[in-house]
Amino acid sequence: MIVIDGSEGEGGGAVVRVSTALAAVTSRSVRVYNIRARRSRSGLSHQHLTAVRAVARISNGTLRGDELGSMELEFSPGRVTGGTFNFDVKTAGSTGLVLQAIMVAAAASEGEIDVTVSGGTDVLWAPTCDYLREVTIPVLEMMGYSARIEIIRRGYYPEGGGRVHAIIEPSELRPITLEESEIHAVRGISHSRNLPVHVAERQAESAMKILRGAGLDVDIMVEDASGPVGRGSGITLWAEGNTRLGAVSLGKPGKRAEKVGSEAARELLGFIESGSPLDRYMGDQIIPYMALTGDSRVRTCELTLHAETNIILSEKITGRRFRVEGERGGPATIEVL
């Protein structure tokens, strides 16, 4: 059994999610202790618990210690054979983080996985489902991955109530080399729920002004996501070309719609101008998949602590060895041997 110190690296829930997901796809048992030990609320939260239970379900595995607040977890996977699954975070916890774990675990599935996850689709400190659909999956498709995501209903903090549906097809991953970017357009979606429609419109207009000012071809769809539960707003932007880059900003009380749009636009513009083909978020998301294929090399605009942590976990669980050229906080080339 592989033993992982949950306080290692970034020390958050990603350690548990990535460890269990890689354990499932490599058929290796894992024990994680000190889970989120340095966080103000240590142990497993609702979204982390949902993620590890989802990985166990789809891999026909067994869990010990899967309780709210648990500081230690043991996981022994079975086989990922496919099937239909439903998971509910029960709060505004991130559906995107749950899907991230499922997607890694499903990388070697023998059959199609049809999964629905309920919770928050557009929440802080997590990839939005738009980002997964428009950035993560297109980049992974370059490695042979096959999946599609549909947002059935958006969910914002604190009420949640969102629902996302994903279908993941059996696939054979292949190595990737991605070191330069060629961007030809920017697309996006600006959305709001139970707020005046001009909120989403102003978010989009603010983003377009900045991006068009930089000479980019920009089109941002405005979506009225109004429904029976909660309210909120946000915008997800992505750059299209030989790769995908993405940026997200969410609204909150007292935050002007123009600021929401400009935040995402300026972050995306920085990613584009870096010349790197992976943004700072995809730079860590791709690492478990690189560990599964080997012989891959990518460049990211920023080496983050999350990326470094994923490298440590991937090396421990898969036995692969990574080499990094660059320093944390700056651009870097990541290679797996």
From Swiss-Prot:
Record-level Gene Ontology MF annotations: ATP binding; RNA-3'-phosphate cyclase activity
EC number(s) on file: 6.5.1.4
Keyword set, alphabetical order: ATP-binding, Cytoplasm, Ligase, Nucleotide-binding
A single Gene Ontology CC term: cytoplasm
Gene3D superfamilies on file: RNA 3'-terminal phosphate cyclase domain, RNA 3'-terminal phosphate cyclase, insert domain
Keyword Ribonucleoprotein found: no
Pfam families: RTC, RTC_insert
Compartment(s) where it occurs, according to its Swiss-Prot or TrEMBL record: Cytoplasm
Binding site for ATP: Q100, Y281, M282, G283, D284, Q285
GO biological process: RNA processing
Known catalytic reactions: a 3'-end 3'-phospho-ribonucleotide-RNA + ATP = a 3'-end 2',3'-cyclophospho-ribonucleotide-RNA + AMP + diphosphate
Tagged with keyword ATP-binding: yes
Positions of the catalytic residues: H306 (tele-amp-histidine intermediate)
PANTHER family from the UniProt entry: RNA 3' TERMINAL PHOSPHATE CYCLASE (PTHR11096), RNA 3'-TERMINAL PHOSPHATE CYCLASE (PTHR11096:SF0)
HAMAP family named in the record: RTC
Similarity annotation: Belongs to the RNA 3'-terminal cyclase family. Type 1 subfamily.
Primary role: Catalyzes the conversion of 3'-phosphate to a 2',3'-cyclic phosphodiester at the end of RNA. The mechanism of action of the enzyme occurs in 3 steps: (A) adenylation of the enzyme by ATP; (B) transfer of adenylate to an RNA-N3'P to produce RNA-N3'PP5'A; (C) and attack of the adjacent 2'-hydroxyl on the 3'-phosphorus in the diester linkage to produce the cyclic end product. The biological role of this enzyme is unknown but it is likely to function in some aspects of cellular RNA processing.
Name of the molecule in the record: RNA 3'-terminal phosphate cyclase
Organism: Methanothermobacter thermautotrophicus (strain ATCC 29096 / DSM 1053 / JCM 10044 / NBRC 100330 / Delta H)
Gene that this sequence comes from: rtcA
